[in-house]
Regions:
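Small/polar/charged residue-enriched interaction surfaces, especially the RNA/DNA-contacting tracks
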Residues: 1-397
Length: 397
């Protein structure tokens, strides 16, 4: 009989939303404790860990005796507490658009997020009655899955939210020879634990990284209500301008579907990008768009008038000020889950993604708002697929 103890510190590399059902500040508030501080419930962690395992390992994590009776899990997962004293919560707007970028009635909402860069600490305890070495391998797999972003937490995980990196793992094993140490040890001074890297994780995904340079301005707007400031500004996270994964997804899904309809193969757009909002049968997306941070940019202000589209006259009271992001550089990361796809489907999807990337490079598609006045254009500087540089012209010809 022994007890395995792990102390984990991890950082969210992208914004995070785990809700509590409240709508006090936004339509979807994040969960907070009685002191108003965000945390990740242990139930959320345990559920994500369990879901990431295969059937055999799920039985180790949560053993079932029969359909009517369950056995207590040997795993204890604590809440993940944030180490920062305070968090500057942010608000994101969510909206559904049709293929012509027209808003769909009843689908405007906002939600609260925790910005990237927060540190979380939690612990895993395993009560091992039989000294089963598989428990240690199971913890290795879970931690490696977090670090490889195979496990993502919370809301909109396939659209860039909820990714983490492991910063530190400390571990200690207690048994009959040192069980008294369990009552007075310091969890911050555990033995450093070498995170086991699962090579098999890499084979589950196709990873694409696209280096991009803005060709002018970009307008993915969020509203301001502070007096004296711009009415609209480009969306930020942690004081950095970003391109949300939802924006990339919308752009790629529309153009991807255009090419998909030209092919005879029976690949449904829902099998790749997930079911749309009107579908009764929800299908999880197999493609992930990471939120992009913009670097080396300029923020330019403009004062503009709203124009009546019928007679081109100015609209009374329609004067507004906006701030847009210009001439920056960024990187788009796309991850395709290959587990439910055959080799032919993977190759087709890769080719179509490269076609969409080429369309972006050529200016045939644009990102964000105000695209009719030249916003949202990019030049592709480099494309990497599974850490190998590819020539865009050769791949799509």
């Amino acid at each position: 009989m022994r007890k395995l103890f792990y102390y984990i510190v991890m950082t969210n590399t992208t914004p995070l939303h785990i809700g509590n059902g409240d709508n006090t500040f936004t339509d979807l508030d994040v969960i907070k404790d009685k002191e108003g501080k965000f945390f990740i419930p242990g139930t959320t962690l345990a559920g994500c860990f369990l879901h990431s395992l295969n059937e055999e390992n799920q039985k180790l994590f949560n053993p079932t005796v029969d359909e009517n009776m369950t056995k207590q899990s040997p795993f204890f997962i604590s809440d993940a507490l944030v180490e920062e004293e305070s968090i500057s919560y942010e608000t994101r707007d969510g909206i559904a658009l049709d293929e012509n970028k027209i808003t769909i009635d009843g689908n405007k909402y906002d939600y609260e997020i925790v910005p990237a860069g927060c540190h979380f600490r939690f612990r895993i305890e395993v009560f091992d009655r039989d000294e089963n070495v598989l428990y240690e391998k199971l913890v290795d797999q879970i931690l490696a899955s977090i670090d490889n972003q195979d496990i993502r937490l919370g809301y909109k995980t396939s659209r860039g939210l909820g990714a983490f990196k492991i910063e530190r793992v400390g571990s200690k094993i207690f048994n009959k020879d040192n069980y008294n140490d369990y009552f007075n040890f310091d969890s911050h001074q555990l033995n450093n634990y070498d995170l086991y890297e699962f090579e098999a994780l890499a084979s589950k995904y196709l990873n694409m990284k696209i280096s991009l340079k803005q060709q002018g301005g970009l307008s993915i707007r969020t509203y301001q209500t502070k007096k004296g400031e711009a009415d609209f500004i480009h969306i930020h996270s942690g004081n950095k301008p970003v391109i949300p994964g939802t924006s990339w997804n919308g752009l790629f899904r529309k153009q991807f579907n255009y090419y998909l309809k030209l092919l005879p193969q029976e690949i449904k757009i829902e099998d790749i990008f997930g079911a749309n909002i009107d579908s009764e049968d929800k299908i999880k997306s197999n493609i992930y768009f990471k939120e992009s941070i913009i670097y080396d940019y300029e923020i330019l202000s403009m004062v503009r008038n709203k124009i009546n589209r019928y007679d081109n006259s100015t609209i009374k009271g329609g004067l507004y000020k906006e701030e847009s992001c210009y001439n920056g550089t960024t990187e788009l990361e796309i991850t395709l889950n290959k587990r439910s796809l055959n080799s032919q489907q993977i190759e087709i999807i890769k080719k179509i993604l490269l076609l969409v990337i080429k369309d972006l490079d050529q200016g045939f598609i644009a990102l964000g708002g105000e695209t009719s006045i030249g916003r949202g254009l990019f030049k592709v500087e480099k494309v990497m697929i599974d850490d190998k540089c590819v020539c865009l012209e050769d791949e799509v010809c």
